[in-house]
Regions:
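Active-site beta-strand/loop signature of hydrolases that rely on acidic residues for catalysis
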Residues: 34-40, 59-84, 111, 149, ...
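Acidic/histidine-rich helix-loop elements
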Residues: 37-57, 103, 127-141, 168, ...
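Metal-dependent phosphoester-hydrolase catalytic domains
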Residues: 116, 173, 177, 184-196, ...
């Protein structure tokens, strides 16, 4: 669905910022995967000039520009997902709303490029003591979920897993138990040791115990970024004067080679942020 003329026009236009590093990363090579983790901020009518209706075209156009293979999104309500599904014709999605297991509440969907990937299996579990049941876990404030899928890369035949999640913003016990639950689920499912990718808004900084669980078992693609780097953080809260100080959004991987990774500054035509979180983006290659 990509239009090369529109790609170069938008990329050169001055209304938004995308790292020049990624202007050369838009087309995945035969044995590579481009992966994005992005909390797009739910459609909140109280967000004023930052409401979804003012941001949605920029988010969709950005995805069209870079044409990733996988996008783990967070805070996606059903109408937002419908818009993205209609706009991004190269992509399909998996996931459910966390409040009813269907369409109610926020999704943590996985969008995938169906021209390059074949979906093999998918499911969603709740981050709680009863993961197969719609539930609030431990001391969490809300229902939290993890949506996962197994894919086959059409060009190489390589199979791999993707897990996408959004941790609770309140419950300390919930966050550490959620990390343990996801790690255990991966070990249970991945009996063939296929590559694994984990995307998400974890509502946690890198020095916390739940993040250490993932860092000890997987590669945190941005772990080596200096804390004083200009692009270190991922959460701005829509503050136009802030680049984001806290790093709470992540991509982890195991069984792949990380070629490039960065946080993307993405703005709308009015100069505001396209979301209150920055996208995390990485390119991987299969190990041969």
């Amino acid at each position: 669905m990509i239009n090369l003329f529109s790609f170069f026009s938008v990329s050169l236009f001055c209304y938004s910022y995308i790292s020049p590093f990624f202007l050369s990363m838009n087309f995945s090579l035969k044995n590579e995967l481009t992966v994005l983790s992005y909390n797009i901020r739910y459609d909140n009518p109280n967000d004023g000039e930052n409401q979804w209706k003012y941001r949605k075209e920029r988010v969709a156009n950005y995805i069209k520009e870079i044409r990733p293979d996988i996008i783990g999104m967070q805070e996606v309500l059903d109408p937002q997902l419908v818009f993205l599904d209609l706009s991004l014709t190269e992509f399909s999605f998996v996931g459910v709303g966390r409040e009813d297991g269907k369409t109610k509440g926020e999704y943590s969907p996985i969008l995938y490029n169906s021209n390059r990937l074949t979906l093999l299996q998918t499911d969603t579990f709740w981050l709680s003591e009863t993961p197969k049941v719609i539930s609030v876990g431990w001391d969490a404030a809300l229902e939290r979920i993890c949506t996962y899928a197994q894919f086959k890369h059409k060009e190489t035949g390589q199979k791999f897993w993707v897990f996408n999640t959004h941790f609770d913003h309140i419950g300390e016990l919930a966050r550490i138990q959620s990390a343990k639950l996801i790690h255990q689920k991966i070990k249970m499912l991945n009996t063939n040791n296929f590559p694994v990718i984990i995307t998400g808004d974890f509502n946690l900084t890198p020095d916390t115990a739940p993040i250490k669980i993932f860092q000890n078992a997987y590669v945190d693609v941005m772990q080596k970024t200096p804390t004083n780097a200009n692009n270190y953080g991922t959460f701005t809260g829509f503050d136009k004067l802030s680049n984001g100080e806290e790093r709470i959004d992540y991509i982890f991987q195991k069984g792949l080679k990380t070629l490039k990774s960065t946080h993307i500054w993405l703005k709308t035509t009015s100069g505001g942020w396209a979301s209150d979180h920055h996208p995390v983006q990485a390119i991987f290659s299969f190990n041969y």
